[in-house]
A protein has these predicted regions:
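Core domains of carbohydrate- and sulfate-ester-processing enzymes
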Residues: 121-122
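Sec-dependent signal peptide recognition
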Residues: 2-10
């Protein structure tokens, strides 16, 4: 009997040793950003739970740009990635809606959609076509916690926006909605890490981004006008390879989902508590903060959304499903 117990214990030990999982998690943001710090807290929390998972962070586009890292996860050469939802739109036409500007009435409206049957279809498509899933739909990581437009001059009207050379990231959704077909700017695709130099050299006049990234990336040094316009309410999806997810046991999965929610709560608290401090620091550094009337922008996008839905840009009926959630 004692021999049986010793053998059984040895098998358990071997099983635990072989269950060790090392996950490579990437981002495109600066290591000093609140997002990167929160991701690192997530990794530390998982490690402390002692379930045999070691998450290693790679920030600042070390593993490539956003589209590259999403593709890495799809192919299984990278395990996890966290950034905007538009990077996932290749796998679901409906995902295009997630980061369209001036579509949702409020953050509450947007997050209600994330919990709806409509968004569940997107998760299913993401798994089937992208070989990855979002694991942090319990606690939304409220990026920013709002988005701003940083520019070399004030931009308060549609006409002024249409005269911009605006940095866009590598996404057809973004170039369509912010560019000439949508809000009217000239969209210039450059990596986020190149925007500072691009603005200094005149390649672009402006960049739209989460408020919490303005200071860490020093964009206020090259664009002294900051427009508060909430063009959309962004959340950060934590994507994991579906193959890797299926290889985890129940305890490991639970450790990941619990830890990502804990880190998400910390992230949200840090950002919410820092907004006024950041505004004051930016003004002290020479920036001017402007409020923007969203109504003309909302009207323009409402027209484009209906037009592009008729053309099959996303599933018929999607806009009506979203409107019913107001």
């Amino acid at each position: 009997m004692k021999n049986f117990i010793r053998i059984f214990a040895a098998l358990l030990f071997c099983s635990g040793a072989h269950a060790q999982q090392v996950l490579r998690m990437g981002s495109i943001v600066a290591p000093a950003s609140v997002q990167a710090q929160a991701m690192d807290r997530f990794a530390d929390s998982v490690k402390k739970k002692n379930v045999g998972v070691d998450i290693r962070s790679f920030h600042g586009s070390q593993l490539g740009g956003g589209p590259d890292q999403v593709r890495n996860v799809q192919l299984g050469v990278q395990d996890m990635f966290m950034d905007g939802m538009t990077f996932l739109s290749d796998f679901s036409d409906d995902m295009r809606m997630a980061e369209t500007p001036f579509t949702f009435a409020s953050r509450e409206h947007f997050e209600k959609w994330l919990q709806s049957a409509s968004f569940k279809k997107i998760q299913e498509e993401l798994i089937a076509k992208g070989n990855q899933r979002i694991i942090n739909l319990g606690v939304s990581w409220r990026r920013g916690p709002m988005r701003v437009l940083v520019a070399k001059r004030p931009v308060l009207t549609l006409e002024e926006f249409g005269n911009l050379r605006l940095r866009a990231w590598q996404s057809e959704v973004i170039t369509r909605f912010y560019g000439k077909p949508g809000l009217g700017a000239t969209a210039i695709v450059i990596p986020l890490g190149d925007v500072y130099v691009g603005m200094r050299q005149g390649v672009v006049d402006a960049v739209t981004l989460p408020f919490d990234l303005v200071q860490p990336m020093k964009f206020h040094e090259v664009g002294s006008h900051i427009m508060l316009w909430d063009e959309y309410w962004q959340v950060l999806p934590m994507n994991i390879s579906e193959k890797k997810w299926q290889a985890l046991n129940d305890a490991q999965r639970r450790a990941l989902t619990e830890s990502v929610d804990e880190a998400g709560n910390w992230y949200n608290e840090q950002l919410a508590a820092s907004v006024e401090k950041w505004k004051a620091e930016l003004v002290k550094a020479g920036a001017t903060i402007h409020n923007v009337n969203r109504a003309p922008f909302v009207q323009r996008i409402a027209e484009r959304n209906r037009q592009w839905q008729k053309e099959g840009y996303w599933r018929a009926g999607l806009i009506d499903e979203i409107e019913k959630l107001r």
